[in-house]
């Protein structure tokens, strides 16, 4: 996601003044977004947080491993509903979003075979350590199968290549994969709310909305 911002999208941290709504004891939605530095992991997470607040839901977020340097591991936890901590507990993720395939594997501990849906981008960014160690990057099907043993479903999306086809840049891969998630109704936030936040951040006629809508059509 890129463009000129009107209102800063930022990490929610512990919580900003949440407007809580009535929720059932187990009414919560847990998302973990991962990738490497420069892919827009934090931006996507903060977009979800703003959308959750817009719908007057209790939202808590956390960024793990600090502000990653470019190509370093990045992880963002987004929790919504009846939650009191910022970190998603083990075996509690409803949704995993991996903007880099290999980065999805360390998140297996958060997955539940009965409910977790994982989305992974097909484009690989090989870690420098693999060249140093002389190891090979696993095939995308191998990564999918390894993750599938922990999840209810794993969906591979050509997010980077499709974003580049639409805009000329893979920068918008995070928005493209979000569009697919919305299309499949795998997230507890309304499409109209996401679009409203994007309009507030980048204006009504911005490329992020174009990418989102293209992903939802295809």
Where are these regions (language model features)?
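Active-site cofactor/cluster-binding pocket
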Residues: 2-9, 13-218
